[in-house]
Amino acid sequence: MKNVPVPLKHTNWGGFTLNSKGLRTPEYQVNKSPNSIRIITIGDSFTFSSNLPYPYHFTVILEDKLESWLRNDVEIINLGIPSVGPQYEQKMLEIEGMRLNPDLVIWAFFVGNDFTDETPLGKEKEISISQNILTKCYFCRLIRNGYILYSYIRTPGARKINKTRESTSGTYIGSPNDYDPNKPTFEKGKFIKIQSVRMSIYAKETFPWDQWKSIQQTLIEVRDTCRYYKIPLLVVIIPDENQVNSNLLEEVVKELRKTMDDFQMGYPQKLLTDFFERYEIDYLDLLPVFKKMGDEKSLYTLQDTHWNIDGNLLAAETIFKYLVDRKASLFNITKSSYNGR
């Protein structure tokens, strides 16, 4: 995976020692165990960690649920990388994911920044040299996005990354008690500014149309790659907190000195789902269930932009239900095919 830069291997990232490839997932073999089910997850920081202790992450919960349902070994290999967009996720899938011969690929698309983190097609000559470097160079983009993120951290001890190398890779060495749901990641003002910037995707006049053209090509290529290898693909659409938390949305709109009439909060999902229907790509839109449950409880970590424990649990349960009720055939198996280990 030398062509796909990832965080440093063996780094202690929030209590989990990244594996020998720099991924927040257990060590794995290229060849899967006989009769086991292997799922690859692709995405950004939501997929990588969501800034939560490892046991609370939706991929871990989903793996346990599928094992219990199928009564069979299920291996979810998490290829999520923080601070990247769809093009880099595509590269990760092609270089590492395809050689692992998965039974299913789950691609997590976060509407909050996956539209704006994509390189526009044919626009290289229209931007400055420094901007062009940022769009072409992963390391530069990682530094840029990382700076934006960590420059807003409220306290020196708030979920920092320990870069001391560990002797055991791909294992969880932390404690669930390391996570404090009441401890904000960003200062309130900085968090509102982050969420205010994201409002551009909810209006036709400010939507990143050039990036959307590029994303469509990326998704079609991913679909075609999976079809070529006969591997089912499911795209999970992750909502932004502005779409789920009505109180936050009111603050953000006020910060922008706008009104709710200036925005269409379901617009990104409408574009995506229409596209997926047209190009026959299986998808799961999490916005309806998150919007419904978001009225009852908080689903995002306080002033953080990522899901909290309840949000990850809801995502895992929703994906699990989708696979069981409607798309069990994605695995090319049936539950009756596996009646014990």
Q: Where do the protein language model's features map onto the residues?
A:
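Membrane/wall-proximal cationic-aromatic binding patches
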Residues: M1-L70, D180-F186, K270-L272, F290-G294, ...
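Short, amphipathic alpha-helical "lid/cap" segments that border enzyme active or binding sites
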Residues: P86, Q90, W212, Q216, ...
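A conserved hydrophobic secondary-structure block that centers on an alpha-helix together
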Residues: L70-K91, I95-M98
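Conserved beta-strand elements of the Class I
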Residues: R38-I42, I77, V105
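Histidine-centered active-site loop/cap adjacent to the catalytic His
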Residues: Q303-R341
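Proline-aspartate-enriched helix->loop->beta-strand connector
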Residues: G97, N101-I106
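Serine-dependent acyl-ester chemistry module
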Residues: F110-F276, I281, V289-G294, F331-R341
